[in-house]
Curated annotation (Swiss-Prot):
GO cellular component: small ribosomal subunit
GO molecular function, one term: rRNA binding
Stated name of the protein: Small ribosomal subunit protein uS5
Function according to Swiss-Prot or TrEMBL: With S4 and S12 plays an important role in translational accuracy. Located at the back of the 30S subunit body where it stabilizes the conformation of the head with respect to the body.
Length: 224
């Protein structure tokens, strides 16, 4: 009788332990889903600095991180995080960058027209380039352009070499870009008169490739 009662008490404990393990599995699965969502973005840490604050008891040290986040397909953002530890500063920078996402108009892997951006003492000049040129830019500007999905571009820093100024000047330049349709509508001209034929051809080709990729994804998803 004693063995039966002990066995009866053991069964609920086994179920509880299984339920708790299953609950942990579901929670872990949820975290995995969020991690996989974040992994779809490109992240670049441009600069990490240690700063100190003098207080009555001495000095307090903290770290700042300048982070670029983008989807590699026209979306990019810049974040600046500050914390007592480097990983926490980077995490804060990533969250701020994702909140500040903006769309960059691209045609065939390059920008739509030359543009110059300024921020504080930073000045960055961006020029479109032909396919195969690559990203010809310095480290800080390159991080922004690569995360934005730009594959061919000429970039030159005309002002301060400070990474923070260069990054913000590059972002300012990208935000000034306009699509050919916007320029044509503002001038009251057909789009062929404001955009080179090569650019329009590259846009048609990129749109055709994107449409083909969507159809292929839909076809593969419909197959059993």
């Amino acid at each position: 009788m004693a063995e039966q009662s002990a066995g009866g008490q053991g069964a609920p404990e086994g179920r509880d332990s299984r339920d708790s393990r299953e609950g942990r599995g579901r929670r872990d699965g949820g975290r995995g889903g969020r991690d996989s969502d974040k992994s779809n973005y490109l992240e670049r840490v441009v600069a990490i600095n240690r700063v100190s604050k003098v207080v009555k008891g001495g000095r307090r040290f903290s770290f700042t991180a300048l982070v670029i986040v983008g989807d590699g397909n026209g979306m990019v953002g810049v974040g600046y995080g500050k914390a007592k530890e480097v990983p926490a500063a980077i995490a804060k920078g990533v969250e701020e960058a994702r909140k500040g996402f903006f769309r960059v108009p691209l045609i065939g892997g390059t920008i739509t027209h030359p543009v110059q951006g300024e921020a504080a003492a930073g000045v960055v000049l961006l020029r479109p380039a032909s396919p195969g040129t690559g990203v010809l830019a310095g480290g800080a500007a390159r991080a922004v352009l690569e995360c934005a999905g730009v594959h061919d571009i000429l970039a030159k820093s005309l002002g301060s070499d400070n990474a923070i100024n260069v990054v913000h000047a590059t972002v300012a330049a990208l935000k000034m870009l306009q699509r050919p349709e916007e320029v044509a509508a503002r001038r009251g001209l057909p789009i062929e008169d404001v955009a080179p034929a090569g650019m329009l051809k590259a846009r048609r080709e990129s749109e055709a490739l994107a449409a083909a990729a969507v159809r292929e994804a839909q076809t593969s998803g419909a197959q059993p």
